[in-house]
């Protein structure tokens, strides 16, 4: 049995002159059904609420004001789920709507609860349809794109693959719209992905969506570090999803790392909410990055913010570049007293244990 996550973007769902939104959803649902009938499980992460809301309200441009975006999303989400429910019912499937904000994943307990809900739904042969809760999320609580959200969902259910359906055929070396010498990149390993993402070689932003290729590279990094293969493909071609379900090498495939960090550390790296920051000296950075060591108090140079035991912090080097995140065994007050020489230093005291420390 395969357990896959499929993410479809706004640019596909809005349709075009040749294919309406209703036809796009019908084709998508038929493809998902064919995969499920073979004994597989699937979760759909869908964008489109704002785009469909604009269409319903006859708005020619995407609103910029947050309250207007939230209102339009509320209108569009109803339309979006009605289309999915109507289509899937004809095909003999039940669906469930799951709307998520960052707070639903920022603690281990809530992440586990979400994982259990997803698993129970697919065990009941229900297709979970996930979207960010754009109608209530403010800027602080938003992922801002469903690419990142889809990667976290893939981690939550220990998926085998994440499929990102978008409006480009492949990852390219350059933006093909502006560079005739751009060439497609068919396969990407973990080392190549880091280089490509860090260089940020391209960014196909569009009017209706909030993503672009950069967010897809970030999603690919999150998923592949957790052991999930990612395949990016052109969702405008209705045959592509069926071909991917049949293991065809279409678009760009991002291969998972050789040694996945696992569900828990992936969550630590990408979903947890941090409340403080710890700066390390060079020796401590090398110890946690190269030796997988716990963070000891002797390696701490500076403490910022207020946090208690069992809260999450960013861990940075002396240049303030983030190297890890972790859950502390000591409060900020205790650490500051030690740094200010008001308490004796026991160099073996653990600040963040390696079991709850994840490199970023």
Swiss-Prot record:
Gene Ontology molecular-function annotations: ATP binding; glutamate 5-kinase activity; RNA binding
List of residues binding substrate: 47, 134, 146
Signal peptide (from-to): none
PUA domain residues: 275-348
The protein's name in its UniProt record: Glutamate 5-kinase
Annotated SUPFAM superfamilies: Carbamate kinase-like, PUA domain-like
Entry EC no(s): 2.7.2.11
Matching SMART domains: PUA (SM00359)
UniProt keyword Amino-acid biosynthesis present: yes
